[in-house]
UniProtKB/Swiss-Prot annotation:
Superkingdom field: Eukaryota
Protein name (database record): Histone-lysine N-methyltransferase, H3 lysine-4 specific
Residue ranges constituting the Post-SET domain according to the UniProt record: 904-920
Enzyme class: transferase
Annotated gene: set1
Enzyme Commission code(s) on record: 2.1.1.354
Entries under PROSITE patterns matching the protein: POST_SET, RRM, SAM_MT43_1, SET
Domain RRM: residue ranges: 94-179
Pfam families per record: N-SET, RRM_1, SET, SET_assoc
Domain text: A construct containing set1 C-terminal fragment of 692-920 is able to form H3K4me. The RxxxRR motif forms an adapter helix that bridges the nucleosome and ubiquitin.
Keywords of the record: Chromatin regulator, Chromosome, Methyltransferase, Nucleus, RNA-binding, S-adenosyl-L-methionine, Transferase
Length: 920
């Protein structure tokens, strides 16, 4: 049956065809069949299928199956969740235990090494409690505040990569330590081993000490066998056995009293009633330190006696102040290369009767000791009196006669001497010497006499003295401590003025000196006045510093001093040939008539030139100074003791401090000793010195808390470091241009030849730079780098460089702007403080931080001697440094960095007069 029905004739009737739906898109769409329904009519179907091999369609099938880039999974991946408070099970370990660490490794080195595995939260390096060295154990905890899982992962990575790694020559042992128990257990074991070793060393040291002690005792016993009988201690006195150490410390001869017996050095039974210093026997070996060594060591202090026994040496004192001064000065000093430690002992029942003088010890001594002490006192007084008489009667006049030759007497002096001798007949005045036995020997003092004839020289001198007295009255406005000190000085000067014989032309009065002064007067020489000071004055001048002793001028006298070549009328009156007058009225009657005759004769005598030199007081120019020496005294315990001189000052001090609350200090002596010892240990002042505030020299930084130690660690700015560090002092730039015509380099000779030939006129500026650059490569400038006063290192010229010469090329890596930004961040992260980046244009930068030449050491200056230029050489841009002016040998090379202005300022340390203060 024909499938095509179009060939049928139209006359035949239409028949219904049988059909079957082969494909219905509504039931399922197939891309190769489309979206139309496919029918089969009258059972006609498609042609039969032909079987074909699909492998034949692929021409490269024989080569094999192509490999895919994605690997096959051997197993399914497990999902990891971050550990939090809702997680089950224990927390993963976030800390590691590191052992077998070198003792030379510090905690900062370990932190820097383990920081590469993760953020380190805590690092505990175990130390030896006895020596402070490292035990080689460390516990490191990673930061788990942000994420516990990240910290645990960092700990695992640290164990994997750091375990077995050699660090400072030793392989590290790194394990996970969840709760730190491994570290604690290892630390206990190491500590037990250290303690065991320490105990062994202590026992060994004690054994050696016992052996040394036994050998020393044997040596002492052997030495004691050779001591003669007269040096052996007496049986009835408080002595020790023959094996004691006191015999070896005594030498047989004393410098003053001859032989030294054991009874003189035995410690008395009532030693606790003495003020003494004890030197323990441990510090003075008997074979090295002797009795004379101790006596020589304490020779500068007024001790009473030195005793000794098996406990050591006892040095007794009569004065608490002398004992305390000796303790402060000689404690922890050396005697025969042995360091001694003094123990201070005071009388328990000692009371203060005076503000400055300690109470006198009243004890009953045995007859032998009392006799020996009295004998020593008498001998000491006789020696002092003999020395004083020799000085005053023999040495003093001889020295004065040798130093002061007799001047030629003037006409006035001759007339006065002749008239006075003819009108008065008085016998010689015997010299009267009155002195106390207890005085210390001292040389006499020489003072100039006051001449009454100079008191009325001119009206100008009177006006000047009135102004001086008026200025003295203005001193009442000074501080209280200065007024107290001035009052004491005034009383001292008045006491000294009482010792001189003052003869005034107005009332002709004679003031007698105090007891203890020796006055020697001669008629043929200038009149000297010898004044022997007392014990109190000697002590006063000894305790006061030389710079603080000032003498106030006698306010009643207009002229204080006269020279030795002037009139000697007063000396004639007080000559040794004069008799002692009966009363003051007799002196006045006898002196009035010769004075009238002298005035009549002098009116006829020729006029002699009178010396107008006046030595009255001090010279004042303008206003008085504001600061006084007492203003610099630190008002602590030493300062108050320095200002308070006598009982009157002490009463003023009590009145000034009466409103202050009282403090419970128990023993005042021990309290004062603690304060002074603390001050001495801190190194503020030495014992015996006054507490004067030191003047700051050079750089000085004031601390708000009072001490730099109490302010902790803080960063000192670079500008402040440049004020006191020697290599950071601000350099002084000499801005004066040094014009020199010297031609020292080969380049200058070449330029001169070109200039003479007219070559320079035809060269363009760029070509001239190129020629100079080629010459620079042929002959480089002599430069070197070294410590700079501007900033760390700098570049210096080793030869003279003329203006406009090429100095050096700035060489480095040429990078882009983006790379430069990343490198700058990396440099900061790595701890490189300085980066050497030089910009050529907007996107090209030269980096000389790690690769370059010494041109990177050129520092910035606001008044530079060089400039930087960018030139083209063979199509490439290069940075070249030119000399902006003549540069001398040894001068540092600088140029202006020209940083853009920013909010974060960088201080400039160039030190130039035109310095802007900041680089940006």
């Amino acid at each position: 049956m024909d499938f095509n029905t179009s060939t049928r004739s139209k006359s035949q009737p239409v028949q219904r065809n049988n059909y079957k739906v082969l494909y219905d898109p509504e039931l399922g769409i197939k891309e190769n069949l489309g979206r139309k329904i496919i029918y089969r009519f009258n059972g006609v179907s498609k042609p039969p299928l032909v079987v074909r091999d699909p492998r034949l369609k692929n021409p490269i099938y024989a080569r094999g199956i192509p490999k895919s880039g994605r690997p096959f999974l051997k197993s399914l991946q497990t999902i990891n969740y971050d550990y939090n408070e809702n997680s089950l099970g224990p927390e993963p370990p976030t800390q590691v235990f590191v052992s077998n660490i070198s003792p030379l490794v510090t905690s900062e080195q370990l932190r820097y090494h383990f920081k590469s595995f993760g953020e380190v939260f805590d690092l505990d390096l175990k130390l030896n409690p006895y020596t402070g060295t490292s035990l080689g154990l460390c516990c490191i905890s990673f930061d788990k505040r942000s994420s516990i899982s990240v910290a645990a992962h960092s700990a695992k990575i640290a164990v994997q990569q750091a375990n077995g790694l050699r660090f400072s020559g030793k392989p590290l042992s790194v394990v996970l330590d969840r709760d730190g128990s491994l570290c604690e257990e290892a630390f206990k074991k190491a500590l037990n081993a250290v303690e065991k070793q320490f105990q062994e060393e202590t026992l060994q040291k004690q054994r050696f000490e016992r052996e040394d002690e036994s050998s020393r005792q044997k040596l002492s016993a052997a030495m004691n066998e050779d001591i003669p009988p007269w040096r052996q201690p007496s049986k009835n006195s408080q002595t020790l056995s023959n094996g004691d150490l006191q015999h070896s410390k005594v030498q047989n001869v004393d410098q003053k009293s001859g032989f030294l017996t054991s009874s003189e050095t035995d410690v008395p039974k009532n030693i606790n009633d003495y003020i003494y210093l004890l030197i323990d026997d441990r510090f003075v070996p008997p074979d090295r330190v002797y009795y004379t060594d101790i006596k020589h060591h304490f020779r500068k202090f007024l001790y009473e006696k030195i005793y000794m026994n098996k406990d050591g040496f006892y040095i007794t004192f009569n004065n608490y102040r002398e004992a305390s001064n000796c303790y402060r000065a000689l404690d922890r000093t050396y005697v025969q290369n042995c360091r001694i430690k003094l123990k201070f002992h005071d009388i328990p029942s000692r009371t203060k009767e005076d503000g400055k003088k300690s109470a006198v010890r009243r004890v009953v001594l045995p007859p032998e000791e009392a006799y020996a002490e009295a004998t020593s006192v008498v001998l000491r007084d006789l020696e002092a009196a003999l020395l004083r008489d020799v000085k005053s009667k023999i040495i003093g006049p001889a020295i004065f006669k040798y130093l002061h030759s007799m001047p030629k007497p003037s006409v006035k002096e001759e007339l006065q001497e002749n008239l006075l001798v003819s009108s008065t007949s008085v016998p010689d005045v015997p010299l009267k010497i009155e002195s106390t036995v207890g005085k210390l020997p001292s040389l006499p003092k020489f003072k100039k006499r006051v001449d009454s004839s100079k008191m009325n020289l001119s009206a100008g001198s009177k006006t000047k003295s009135k102004l001086q007295r008026r200025r003295r009255r203005r001193h009442e406005a000074r501080p209280l401590h200065y007024q107290l000190n001035q009052m004491y000085n005034s009383s001292a000067s008045e006491a000294e003025s009482d010792q001189e014989l003052l003869l005034s032309s107005g009332d002709e009065r004679v003031e007698r000196g105090k007891i203890g002064s020796i006055k020697s007067v001669k008629s043929d020489e200038a009149t000297p006045v010898f004044s022997d000071t007392s014990d109190e004055n000697d002590k006063f001048h000894r305790f006061r510093t030389k710079s603080k002793i000032s003498k106030k001028k006698y306010e009643k006298m207009e002229v204080d001093y006269t020279s030795s070549s002037e009139t000697e009328s007063d000396a004639s009156i007080l000559s040794p040939s004069a008799a002692i007058p009966k009363s003051g009225s007799a002196i006045k009657d006898e002196l009035i008539s010769p004075k009238k005759e002298i005035d009549e004769v002098l009116a006829l005598a020729p006029k002699w030139r009178i010396n107008e030199f006046d030595e009255t007081g001090s010279v004042y120019y303008g206003a008085l100074p504001y600061n006084y020496p007492e203003d610099d005294v630190l008002l602590d315990l030493d300062g108050l003791q320095y200002l308070v001189k006598n009982d009157e000052d002490y009463s003023y001090l009590q009145e000034a401090l009466k409103d202050e609350p009282l403090m419970d200090i128990n023993d005042p002596n021990f309290w004062a000793y603690e304060r002074k010892s603390c001050k001495f240990k801190n190194g503020d002042v030495k014992y015996g010195d006054t507490a004067i505030l030191p003047e700051p020299k050079g750089y000085f930084r004031s601390n708000t808390s009072g001490s730099a130690k109490s302010e902790g660690y803080y960063i000192i700015p670079t500008t402040e470091k440049s004020l006191y560090l020697p290599l950071r002092n601000r350099s002084t730039i000499d801005t004066i241009s040094h014009s020199t015509s010297r031609i020292t380099s080969r380049m200058n000779r070449v330029n001169n030849r070109r200039l003479a030939a007219g070559v320079e006129k035809s060269q363009l500026p760029a070509e001239a730079d190129l020629l100079r650059f080629n010459a620079l490569k042929a002959r480089k400038k002599q430069l070197h780098f070294g410590p700079s006063r501007i900033h760390t290192l700098g570049l210096f010229a080793m030869e003279n460089i003329d203006k406009n010469d090429m100095v050096i090329e700035y060489i480095g890596e040429i990078i882009r702007q983006r790379v430069a930004d990343n490198r700058e961040k990396n440099y900061v992260r790595e701890g490189i403080g300085d980066s050497y980046l030089f910009r050529i244009d907007e996107d090209v930068i030269v980096d000389a931080t790690k690769k370059g030449n010494i041109a990177r050491f050129i520092n910035h200056s606001c008044a530079p001697n060089c400039i930087a230029r960018i030139i083209r050489v063979e199509g490439k841009r290069k940075i070249v440094i030119y000399a902006d002016r003549d540069i001398m040998h040894g001068e540092e090379l600088t140029y202006d960095y020209k940083f853009p202005e920013e909010a974060d300022k960088i201080p400039c340390l160039c030190g130039a007069p035109t310095c802007r203060g900041y680089l940006n």
